[in-house]
């Protein structure tokens, strides 16, 4: 089973429990904390990957680090991953859980490629225009500056791409010209 599938399976189980308890956002914040610790402390994963370190010591390390900050359900999920030797799925679990929670709320992330950095006002306008097109209530806009676009915007929401860039228009024109020969 792929890493993403494993992380998703645990995320779905935890999300269902969170929904029952009415704590989906609380669990998300807790998992974001765990993800942040793993991402800012690469040594942690190195230690957890050590085959010479006993599994119970690895669990104790994480328990000591997180127990005061996590609900029992989130801590138990992390412990379960550790027991099964799937420490590398902890960060993936956080991402998958966030995706589930966002889907439930009708929120998606939009990557907007532009020639120059966008202002907050421009990001808000783009979110307002593209959220309904993507079938979402709200979009979180992440701006990526790409000078190859020449001008205009390219917006990616999930697997959908809205290409209004000059580069995209030129490519479409080229295809039409080649097809018309």
Curated annotation (Swiss-Prot):
Indicate the principal place this protein occupies in or around the cell: membrane
What PANTHER family does this protein's entry cite?
ATP SYNTHASE DELTA CHAIN (PTHR11910)
**Does the record carry Ion transport as a key word?**
yes
Assembly mode: F-type ATPases have 2 components, F(1) - the catalytic core - and F(0) - the membrane proton channel. F(1) has five subunits: alpha(3), beta(3), gamma(1), delta(1), epsilon(1). F(0) has three main subunits: a(1), b(2) and c(10-14). The alpha and beta chains form an alternating ring which encloses part of the gamma chain. F(1) is attached to F(0) by a central stalk formed by the gamma and epsilon chains, while a peripheral stalk is formed by the delta and b chains.
**Gene3D superfamilies assigned to the protein according to its UniProt record, in alphabetical order:** N-terminal domain of the delta subunit of the F1F0-ATP synthase
Q: List the disulfide bonds.
A: none
**Key word ATP-binding present:** no
Entry GO terms, CC: plasma membrane; proton-transporting ATP synthase complex
Indicate the family of this protein: Belongs to the ATPase delta chain family.
Q: Which Pfam families match?
A: OSCP
**By its UniProt entry, which NCBIfam families does this protein fall under?**
ATP_synt_delta (TIGR01145), PRK05758.2-4 (NF004403)
The record describes its membrane topology as: Peripheral membrane protein
User: Main role?
Assistant: F(1)F(0) ATP synthase produces ATP from ADP in the presence of a proton or sodium gradient. F-type ATPases consist of two structural domains, F(1) containing the extramembraneous catalytic core and F(0) containing the membrane proton channel, linked together by a central stalk and a peripheral stalk. During catalysis, ATP synthesis in the catalytic domain of F(1) is coupled via a rotary mechanism of the central stalk subunits to proton translocation. This protein is part of the stalk that links CF(0) to CF(1). It either transmits conformational changes from CF(0) to CF(1) or is implicated in proton conduction.
Q: What PROSITE patterns does the record tag this protein with?
A: ATPASE_DELTA (PS00389)
Q: Where in the cell is it found?
A: Cell membrane
Protein name per its UniProtKB record: ATP synthase subunit delta
Q: Care to name a GO molecular-function term for this sequence? A: proton-transporting ATP synthase activity, rotational mechanism
Q: Which UniProt keywords apply?
A: ATP synthesis, Cell membrane, CF(1), Hydrogen ion transport, Ion transport, Membrane, Transport
């Amino acid at each position: 089973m792929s890493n993403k599938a494993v992380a998703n399976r645990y995320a779905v189980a935890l999300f269902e429990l969170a929904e029952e308890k009415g704590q989906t956002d609380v669990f998300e914040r807790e998992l974001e904390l765990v993800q942040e610790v793993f991402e800012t402390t690469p040594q942690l994963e190195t230690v957890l990957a050590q085959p010479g370190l006993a599994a119970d010591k690895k669990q104790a390390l994480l328990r000591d680090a997180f127990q005061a900050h996590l609900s029992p359900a989130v801590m138990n999920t992390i412990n379960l991953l550790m027991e099964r030797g799937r420490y590398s799925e902890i960060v993936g679990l956080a991402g998958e859980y966030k995706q589930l929670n966002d889907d439930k709320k009708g929120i998606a992330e939009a990557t907007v490629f532009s020639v120059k950095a966008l202002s907050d006002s421009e990001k808000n306008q783009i979110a307002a225009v593209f959220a309904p097109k993507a079938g979402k209530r709200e979009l979180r806009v992440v701006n990526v500056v790409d000078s190859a676009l020449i001008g205009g915007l390219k917006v990616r929401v999930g697997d959908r791409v809205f290409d209004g860039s000059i580069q995209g228009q030129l490519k479409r024109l080229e295809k039409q010209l080649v097809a018309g020969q």
